[in-house]
C-alpha cells in the first residue's frame, strides 16, 4: 500500500513538474502563433501580431532594429501584449519549411496585404485593430499609434466580455455587433463566436442564425481550400444548403458557392458543377439571381458538350450573383 502511495505521489509531482515546464515565456518576442495565443489566454493579454520579411524588406528590418527589438519597446508593451513575430525571410525557406508553411497559412487567414503588417488580436485570435507604422517609427510614435487604436480595441473587448455574461439576448446582440465591426474578409476567424451564437439561439428566434451557419461554412471551406481539398470545401456549402433554417435565397447562394468553388478550381467535373447550379436555381427560381444562374447552366452544358470555354463562369458573373444575393 505504501508503495502505491509513493507511486501516486511521484505521478502527481511529475505532472506538476511537466505543467510548470510548459509555461510560455512571453517576456520577449515569440515566433510561434499557437504559443502566443496560449500565453495571451493564460495571462489575459492582447496579442500584437507582426508579419515581417527582415532579409528582403527594408522597412521590416529598420522597424525591428530601431523600435520593436529595443529593450524599451519590449519592456513597455509586454505588460499588456504578447508579442509575436512571424518572419518570412528567404533563409527560412531552406531551414524551416514546415513552420514557414504554417506561418504563411496564418498570414493568408488574416488576409494580410503586405510586409510588414500589424494586427492587435484578442487572446482568442480575433482581430481587434489593424495598425500602421512608418519606417522611421520610434517609441514615441508607437505610443501614439497604440493610443489612437485604444478606443477601438477597448470597445471590442467590452463586446467580447458581453458575449460571456448576461441574458441570451444580450450575448447574441454582442456577437452580432462584433461581426458588424469586423472586416468581412476576417469574419472566418470568428468561428467560435458563430458556434456560440447558434448554441444560444437553437430555435433561430433572432432570425439571424443562418448568418452564423453561413460564416461557419465559409470558415471551414477556407481551411479546406487552402489545403487543396476542393471537394471538402464544396461539401461545406452543400451541407449548409440542406439546413432548414436558411431562406430559399440563402439556400440558392450556398449551392451556387459550392458550384463556383468547384468550377473555379479547374475541375473538369462539369456534371457536378451543373448539378450544384441546377439546385441553386431550383431553390429560388423567382429570385433576382435566377436569370444569371440560367446563363451559368447553359455555359456549363456547353462545356459538357465540348463546345464551351472552361473559364466561362467568370469573376464578373460571380460578382453579379453576390450583389444580387446581398440586395435580397
Language model region names:
Residues 18-19:
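C-terminal motif of bacterial Sec signal peptides marking the signal peptidase cleavage site
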Residues 134-211, 215:
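Thiol-/selenol-based redox modules, centered on thioredoxin-like
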Amino acid at each position: 500500500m505504501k508503495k502505491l502511495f509513493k507511486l501516486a505521489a511521484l505521478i502527481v509531482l511529475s505532472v506538476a513538474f511537466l505543467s510548470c515546464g510548459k509555461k510560455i515565456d512571453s517576456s520577449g518576442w515569440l515566433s510561434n502563433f499557437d504559443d502566443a495565443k496560449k500565453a495571451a489566454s493564460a495571462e489575459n493579454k492582447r496579442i500584437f501580431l507582426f508579419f515581417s520579411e527582415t532579409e528582403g524588406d527594408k522597412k521590416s528590418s529598420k522597424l525591428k532594429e530601431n523600435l520593436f527589438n529595443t529593450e524599451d519597446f519590449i519592456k513597455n508593451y509586454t505588460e499588456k501584449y504578447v508579442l509575436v513575430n512571424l518572419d518570412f525571410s528567404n533563409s527560412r525557406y531552406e531551414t524551416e519549411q514546415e513552420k514557414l508553411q504554417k506561418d504563411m497559412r496564418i498570414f493568408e487567414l488574416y488576409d494580410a496585404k503586405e510586409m510588414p503588417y500589424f494586427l492587435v488580436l484578442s487572446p482568442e485570435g480575433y482581430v481587434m485593430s489593424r495598425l500602421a507604422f512608418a519606417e522611421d517609427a520610434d517609441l514615441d510614435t508607437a505610443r501614439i499609434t497604440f493610443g489612437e487604436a485604444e478606443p477601438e480595441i477597448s470597445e471590442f473587448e467590452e463586446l467580447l466580455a458581453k458575449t460571456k455574461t448576461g441574458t441570451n439576448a444580450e450575448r447574441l446582440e454582442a456577437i452580432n455587433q462584433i461581426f458588424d465591426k469586423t472586416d468581412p474578409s476576417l469574419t472566418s476567424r470568428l468561428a467560435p463566436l458563430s458556434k456560440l451564437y447558434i448554441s444560444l439561439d437553437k430555435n433561430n428566434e433572432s432570425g439571424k442564425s443562418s448568418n452564423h451557419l453561413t460564416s461557419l461554412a465559409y470558415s471551414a471551406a477556407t481551411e479546406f481550400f487552402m489545403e487543396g481539398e476542393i471537394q471538402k470545401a464544396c461539401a461545406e456549402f452543400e451541407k449548409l444548403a440542406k439546413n432548414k433554417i436558411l431562406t430559399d435565397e440563402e439556400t440558392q447562394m450556398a449551392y451556387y458557392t459550392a458550384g463556383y468553388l468547384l468550377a473555379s478550381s479547374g475541375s473538369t467535373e462539369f456534371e457536378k458543377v451543373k448539378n450544384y447550379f441546377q439546385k441553386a436555381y431550383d431553390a429560388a427560381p423567382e429570385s433576382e439571381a435566377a436569370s444569371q444562374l440560367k446563363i451559368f447552366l447553359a455555359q456549363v452544358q456547353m462545356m459538357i458538350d465540348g463546345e464551351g470555354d472552361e473559364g466561362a463562369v467568370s469573376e464578373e458573373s460571380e460578382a453579379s450573383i453576390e450583389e444580387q444575393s446581398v440586395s435580397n
